[in-house]
Amino acid sequence: MDRIRIVGGNKLNGTIPISGAKNAALPLMIAALLTDETLILENVPRLADVALLQRILGNHGVDIMSAGKRPGDREHQGQTLHISAANIIDTTAPYDLVSKMRASFWVIGPLLARMKEANVSLPGGCAIGTRPVDLLIMALEKLGAEIVIDGGYAVARAPQGLHGAEIEFPKVTVSGTHVALMAATLAKGTTVITNAACEPEIADVADCLNKMGAKITGAGTSRIVIEGVEKLHGARHAVLPDRIEAGTYAMAVAMTGGDVQLQGARPELMQAALDVLIEAGATITQTNEGIRVQRNGSGIRPVDVSTSPFPGFPTDLQAQLMALMTRAEGSSRITETIFENRFMHVQELARFGARIALDGETATIEGRPKLRGAPVMATDLRASVSLVIAALAAEGETMVNRIYHLDRGFERLEDKLSACGATIERISG
């Protein structure tokens, strides 16, 4: 199993190209199921989750061709995928694939809309009554689907096709919004989604769907209106830059000090995170190429932050911010309001000497002037990269184990950091 070795203490200086957003690329790939023509997606990141979704779509009979730079090439370029779902041969998404990635459950919407049926395994680890898929299923039922849970599968049918509906989510749900949006494009009549998630990735998916012939307005706001159409066609679309990746590297620069250009990053996608970084002592400048992040001389200032849906501070940057605050000059508080049990990185950060106390969904971090390198273990995607950020500033050597989590969401992380002066390497085996 691969590991990452880091020797801390180097400032980061240079340019980091920002990859396409995983959280847009996955639903965009799934949207290809809505048409029998070819969807061409540019700037798709080379990630383990993208490769897994290719396998899942292939199981349905989808043909995918890839072009672009190969892993290991020094020059960054996202791959281009040509996705053709002309011949869907199977509407079942089996447990052995869906259990590996929750977002793969989203195929239920496009399959139901186009094929009028879908049998999709429930994602692993979903307790009855607290499943994130409950709101998603509710939305599809509003659109006229008949869905029963049988043997761990959502068995969905819409013999007469889907119809427009008023869908009001009781709480903001990214997955529910994505699936309702995709399914409603082929429904008869008008669908109105209220209390919709406002994430930029949802607006990006809607933009692509409109290029395919959908009639969607309001995506990126809490009220989305979809006029159903009879058929969607092929299109070409470039995945928007990954605001979470950009925010992660920005926090790494704030942690180590230095001066880095985040090439392709868009400040309007991540203003809440940039505001927090400025409060913490970083200098942020918008440039023609993206965003420039600097911290030279001044210390890291403590901040108090609560996660919230877009445009608030994203939960996917919470662990990275906590790593940064371990070296702040004072006490910080971070409250997690989106997900339960998202403080699994606390125990591993403590191995560096971090002082973090938990009280329910709030973490209090007492900043320390120095961290020390240690062997640590990644527990999930965002937690794993927080350990890398801590290691970059720690004295001595750190070995990060179970880095397959990193490969799910960060393209060539060690190459990008190494190019900016970090002492970091992947150790295979």
UniProtKB/Swiss-Prot annotation:
Kindly state which reaction or reactions the protein catalyses: phosphoenolpyruvate + UDP-N-acetyl-alpha-D-glucosamine = UDP-N-acetyl-3-O-(1-carboxyvinyl)-alpha-D-glucosamine + phosphate
* Compartments in which it is found: Cytoplasm
Q: Which organism is it from?
A: Afipia carboxidovorans (strain ATCC 49405 / DSM 1227 / KCTC 32145 / OM5) (Oligotropha carboxidovorans)
Quick one: a GO biological-process term for this protein?
Answer: peptidoglycan biosynthetic process
Q: Which UniProt keywords apply?
A: Cell cycle, Cell division, Cell shape, Cell wall biogenesis/degradation, Cytoplasm, Peptidoglycan synthesis, Pyruvate, Transferase
Q: Where is the active site?
A: C126 (proton donor)
Q: What is this protein called?
A: UDP-N-acetylglucosamine 1-carboxyvinyltransferase
Give the encoding gene's name.
murA
Q: Which HAMAP family match?
A: MurA (MF_00111)
Classification from the root reads: Bacteria, Pseudomonadati, Pseudomonadota, Alphaproteobacteria, Hyphomicrobiales
